[in-house]
Amino acid sequence: MKLPIYLDYAATTPVDERVAKKMMEYMTKDGVFGNPASRSHKFGWEAEEAVDVARNQIADLIGADAREIVFTSGATESDNLAIKGAAHFYQTKGKHIITVKTEHKAVLDTCRQLEREGFEVTYLEPETTGLVDIAKLEAAIRPDTILVSVMQVNNEIGVIQPIEEIGKICRAKKIIFHVDATQSVGKIPVDVQALNVDLMSFSSHKLYGPKGIGGLYVCRKPRVRLEAIIHGGGHERGMRSGTLPVHQIVGMGEAYRIAKEEMVTEMPRIKALRDRLYNGFKDMEEVYVNGTMEAGKRVDSNLNISFNFVEGESMMMSLKDIAVSSGSACTSASLEPSYVLRALGLNDELAHSSIRFSIGRWTTEEEIDHTIEIVKKAVTKLRELSPLWDMFKEGIDLNSIEWSHH
């Protein structure tokens, strides 16, 4: 077993060897290096053909038509293009947007920007399970609501939102529905037709493809219009200008092809490892799973646990041979408790003591068992150092204590 152990697959994934090998054929002078927009010679034609193949591979995984896939630099850009693009195009119909407090920063900060431009945004509170209450969402809809944005799988707690039901409501009321599916494609079955989704963002690097490339599904029937946020040569049907990075697109296509082929065998294996990890922790004292564990409502690769009376940062330091995250990769650089966990109603202490384990293609049973052992030791050691743990063990109600300020 090689140390450190990587259990942060929700932050990024290594590129699959098969993907890297394929990408190498699209870079040098001996490979296909042309610009797909060069329509007058063989170099451009070959590049365009490679892009078409990848576009089809990506569309296949989500049940879309290849013409509905727009390439971007990643899911953050896709979220920006979807939300700003739809809001600006449809603003004559209304300026109200609905989203959820536990969305990714790429959605929340885009909505904040639109608020500065005069749009109004309703941020829904999730239930303690992490899931959206459909009735609350429906109640928030107004005559001037033009867009609803809800992620399919949460990046921190892995819960699967009821996208199909939300899609039905939006379709019936003719409201544009955007879904950030960065953490769901290739991990759960995704079919944009069945889900009634108008816009869907996804990435390559969460699915064993290269970083720096992503996509946005833009529904053709009923047709959804967007105002571009990057202008130039009119690439991607005018929605996203810029020379297409063929090697990255080919890599993403190959990664999606492999995911479609291997998902049925890969996900049950990953689920077994996740359950093994959970079973290793579940009998410990004061250990809480964040987000629902109900079957079908959580992605198989995610386990987010709070170890009470242990500070997340010191826990991370004690796990130097295990790569996990406290909060999400985008917020783990800050010392703020996770806003996702706070939105679930967790207090600061529990939010601070959370660790996200995310399992992937190359995780082994041996690594899981070693992780359980190391984490248990670290928790025991850190709790021994904690006066709060001693007080808790003595039966003192910590919430009733008046702490004095010095």
Curated annotation (Swiss-Prot):
Annotated active site: C330 (cysteine persulfide intermediate)
Coiled coil: none
Short name of one Pfam family: Aminotran_5
Keyword Transferase: yes
Catalytic activity: (sulfur carrier)-H + L-cysteine = (sulfur carrier)-SH + L-alanine
Molecular function via GO: 2 iron, 2 sulfur cluster binding; cysteine desulfurase activity; metal ion binding; pyridoxal phosphate binding
Residues modified as N6-(pyridoxal phosphate)lysine: K206
Localization terms from the record: Cytoplasm
Domain of life: Bacteria
Cofactor(s) this protein cannot do without: pyridoxal 5'-phosphate
Family label: Belongs to the class-V pyridoxal-phosphate-dependent aminotransferase family. NifS/IscS subfamily.
Role played: Master enzyme that delivers sulfur to a number of partners involved in Fe-S cluster assembly, tRNA modification or cofactor biosynthesis. Catalyzes the removal of elemental sulfur atoms from cysteine to produce alanine. Functions as a sulfur delivery protein for Fe-S cluster synthesis onto IscU, an Fe-S scaffold assembly protein, as well as other S acceptor proteins.
Quaternary structure and partners: Homodimer. Forms a heterotetramer with IscU, interacts with other sulfur acceptors.
The protein, known as: Cysteine desulfurase IscS
Name of the gene this protein is made from: iscS
